[in-house]
Design a protein with these regions (language model features):
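ATP-dependent carboxylate-amine ligase catalytic core
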Residues: 2-110, 118-142, 150-157
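Beta-strand->loop->alpha-helix junctions that form or flank phosphate-binding loops
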Residues: 37-38, 171-179, 268-276
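C-terminal and late-domain segments of enzyme folds
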Residues: 107, 212-213, 237-239, 251-261, ...
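A short helix->loop->beta-strand "cap" motif at the edges of active sites that frequently abuts
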Residues: 112, 169, 316-320
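Cysteine-nucleophile active-site neighborhood
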Residues: 294-372
Length: 452
């Protein structure tokens, strides 16, 4: 099985473009690939899934223990013919000024070879020096080959012998610049897959170009590894409760692994759209409002008053609810759109969502619960991450968050039926799915007792 990590010296090198092109090309070659993304990013896995339906998941060495990452990899890679893991940021760049949760740490944890994506613009011999530095920075870098991105055929033919001689690494090919296949960006990184016109056509052009300019035989020889040992599937519970999950263009940041954990815990997930639907699904015993871009759809969310009222009444009535980041903003009083206009929201929580114009409390942190609640026990902590350009006038204070000795804050609203806050939670390997489903089951029993 071909298994490898796509990494680069720095952000903006075209890792996602190359990864999507590779996945599409592997799919064309009948390899049935699956993809992983290093780190907490939501958008890149959405892109991976848009490439001819390729399965994609997150692997995060900050949010998850090494054994959990290995088990997730083995579980989701099973049955596929190739695995492509896309790194984040620069190869060694992790949490703070460390390699923790970096693409290198993921490659090291999984013992996978690395294909280094390099943009050669403005350098030649210096590229060799930079690559040498990356190779020798750690005793085992796992770097096995080089791919040139945004490179002409003429430049490739000049650089290939130079780089191979100076680094000892094979240069496997290049991806030429294709102006007709450019993917635009957004404030969380790349735009979401559903927003880009002719996405399939653009990725098809990239795949064709890469397939024609890649040494597939060498790539296969460098990346062939035994398939990971299968992991016994977790025992499925049968709680018999329905949990409504918001899923549309405003709420699109839910980890596939989190949803799988909820299913394993016994929940039946029912998807709905706070933008388009007029009311919540029937017979639900829980509500999950993940993150996304509600600020970009504040007007249609606000104008859908029947849905706002339904959610407000349900949450205030004790429906077990989890609202992360964008979902948290939706539960507030108002939410400013990109122009600064404030639109009424569900009105469950006291804060107002406001545009800040810069990243707010960005990155990984450690969150500790102050009291028992739907998802947490008092004193329990969880690794979390935040990434948002909007803030709230009231972020809550039911959790303590520690980022460093100098950077700490309080946030979140928690009760025996609610978690709401900016922090994104990663549920895998934690008791959170079981507790959420248990809360839904308790709510279901209460409803039945009330109706009897």
């Amino acid at each position: 099985m071909m298994q490898f990590v796509i990494a680069a010296p720095r952000s903006g090198s075209g890792k996602t473009t190359v990864t999507c092109a590779l996945l599409a090309a592997l799919k064309k070659r009948g390899m049935d690939p699956c993809a992983f993304k290093s780190g907490p990013d939501y958008i890149d896995p959405m892109f991976h899934r848009s490439v001819l339906g390729v399965e994609s998941h997150n692997l995060d060495r900050y949010l998850s223990a090494k054994n959990t990452v290995r088990e997730l990899y083995a579980h989701y890679a099973a049955g596929h013919g190739a695995v492509v893991c896309e790194g984040a940021m620069g190869f060694y760049d992790g949490q703070g000024l460390t390699t923790r949760a970096s693409a290198w740490e993921l490659a090291d944890a999984l013992d996978l070879p690395v294909l280094l994506v390099v943009q050669p613009k403005g350098a030649s011999v210096t590229l060799a020096a930079e690559i040498q530095g990356l190779v020798h920075f750690k005793p085992e870098s796992h770097i096995a080959g080089i791919l040139l991105n945004d490179c002409s055929e003429k430049l490739f033919r000049m650089l290939k012998p130079l780089l191979e001689t100076e680094t000892g690494l094979p240069v496997l090919g290049y991806l030429p610049r294709l102006p007709q296949a450019v993917v635009e960006s957004r404030h969380l990184g790349l735009k979401t897959a559903g927003e880009i016109t002719d996405l399939a056509q653009k990725i098809g052009l990239l795949a064709d170009a890469l397939e024609a300019n890649l040494d597939w035989a060498t790539l296969e020889a460098l990346t062939e590894r035994p398939a990971p040992a299968p992991v016994p599937p977790p025992a499925l519970q049968t709680a018999g409760v329905r949990i409504a999950v918001a899923q549309d263009k405003a709420f699109c940041f839910a980890y596939a692994e989190t949803l799988d954990c909820l299913r394993t815990a016994g929940a039946e997930l029912v998807f709905f759209s706070p933008v388009h639907d007029t009311t919540l699904p029937e017979d639900i015993c829980g509500l999950y409002l993940p993150g996304g871009y509600p600020e970009l759809y504040a007007r249609p969310l606000s104008e859908n008053k029947t849905m706002r009222d339904a959610i407000r009444d349900a949450v205030n009535g004790g429906l077990p609810t989890v609202a992360e980041c964008g979902g948290f903003l939706y539960l507030g009083q108002t939410l400013e759109d990109a122009s600064g206009t404030a639109w009424p929201m569900a009105g469950v929580l006291p804060g107002k969502g406001v545009k800040v114009g810069r990243l707010v409390r960005f990155g990984y942190a450690d969150m500790t619960a102050k009291a028992d609640s739907l998802l947490f026990h008092a004193g329990e902590h969880l690794y979390i991450h935040e990434f948002h350009h909007w803030d709230s006038t009231d972020n809550g204070s039911d959790f303590s968050v520690w980022k460093s000795e100098k950077v700490q804050w309080e946030c979140g609203f928690a009760s025996m039926s609610l978690y709401a806050g900016f922090p994104h939670l990663y549920w895998v390997g934690t008791p959170l799915p079981r507790r959420f489903v248990s809360g839904a089951k308790f709510y279901q029993r209460q409803k039945r007792n009330t109706h009897d």
